[in-house]
Amino acid sequence: MKNITDYIQQWANTYKDDMQNNIMPFWIKYGLDRVNGGIYTCVDRDGALMDSTKSVWFQGRFAFTCSYAYNHIEKNPAWLQAAKSTLDFIEKYCFDSDGRMYFEVTADGRPLRKRRYIFSESFAAIAMSEYSIASGDKTYAVKALELFKRMQYFLQTPGLLAPKYRDTLPMKGHSITMI
């Protein structure tokens, strides 16, 4: 290895190759729900569906990953279409009437669980933002900003997000700042 730049470039090429030839093809082939939209989140290494429930934050992560890969790795129309399908699923099924997002839904979008934190919202917002860049559809930039502002409201309004710990042992988690 000549220098650190060559070393970093070698790893960048390895990761890019893995995304193009392994990760993205696998999830496009086995993960996409071609009936209801969105992405299945529990498939085995052979692509067999193990559980049809869908993690909502994973929907956002997948839509972001597809959009980001489209913007930075390869202008693959299948990736952009997968991002759009997943965002359509999110918008149609993953928001509760109070503006918060569910944590988990059935394959056809019926709510199963809702959590006290805003991970689903975080990943949906970055997915919408990146998709706006990939597609040129600025309405998704507006949606991302609106969702981000809603997240700020949830975080800054006492009582909207239930505390994880009781007052007997005050603590502050780092998950929100990491997201």
For each predicted feature, which ranges?
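Glycan-recognition and catalytic cores of secretory/periplasmic carbohydrate-active enzymes
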Residues: M1-I179
